[in-house]
Amino acid sequence: MTAKKTTLKNIKKIGVLGAGQMGKGIAQVAAQTGFETVMVEPYDEVRKKAREGIIKSLDRSVDLGKIKKKEHDQILDRMTFAKDIESLDDVDFVIEAAVESTAVKEDIFKSLDRICASHVILTTNTSSVRLGKLASVTSRPEKVVGMHFMYPAQKMKLLEIIRTPATSDESYNIVKDLSIKMGKQPITVTDSPCFITSRLIQTFINEAIFCLYQGVSSKEEIDTAMKLGMNHPMGPLELADFIGLDVVLSMQQALYNGFQEPKYRPCPLLLSLVEVGHLGRKTGKGFYDYNADGSKKD
């Protein structure tokens, strides 16, 4: 019997693993594109919040006239929210969007390789984990591809497609075509530390932290310089707080460890803030202090 092949045409059901900020946005994009979508999240509260967040996002689209109420309901009808990874045993394509940890993602890819049919392409939304490490724990390295969506996934057009030397042209082309079908503008990146977007933004953030650390200027003026001088919507220190300083440190360490070049060494000030639990908006304190609703304190 001839083994089933994955083509864009026969992808009907997409599995999204992880219901955090990225996962819920990716699942919404998949369902809005017309795919039956299974979102897997083991934590009940996170799964519940993800569903509520998607409904709120769709409600907003209706209010703005971007979609009709009928479309809103059809999108939700295409979505299933599951607790167990075994629920992905009949999907045609997988996008993993779990926590940014090599060990966690390796365990997930081992499970996906066991659960999913052999023709299924396994993708990851990682922003910093080396794709080759994930491909190496599967029996299908040629079908492991990176799909790095930008935040928020339902709004941002760019998508980084990451391929390893083992990634087949067939798998790459399917992911590229799927990205375009989802309304994204894909760019192709090799399996290099932090790829393009994370590499550039983390270098930018780290240099801003060094400016603060070395007394070049105040945090407010560093951020103002980039907002008013370069037309950035957020200053680099505000952006770091928004991302989460623990996540920022993790990505910068991935860059430094990947290249072993001094220019990527994380600033000691960032390490100090993370060590004492000042992680940005999510903890109420980072470079700035925040209210419970995430707004910056005066």
Labelled PLM ranges:
Residues 121-190, 198-199:
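Rossmann-fold dinucleotide-binding core
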Residues 2-8, 35, 170-173, 180-191, ...:
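NAD(P)-dependent Rossmann-like dehydrogenase/reductase catalytic/cofactor-binding core
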Residues 32-35, 152-162, 233-234, 253:
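Acidic/polar active-site rim loop that often engages polyanionic ligands
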Residues 39-72, 161-171, 186, 193-201:
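Rossmann-like dinucleotide-binding cores of NAD(P)H-dependent redox enzymes
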Residues 2-59:
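NAD(P)+-binding Rossmann beta1-loop-alpha1 motif at the extreme N-terminus of oxidoreductases
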Residues 45, 49, 60-121, 129:
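Rossmann-like NAD(P)-binding element
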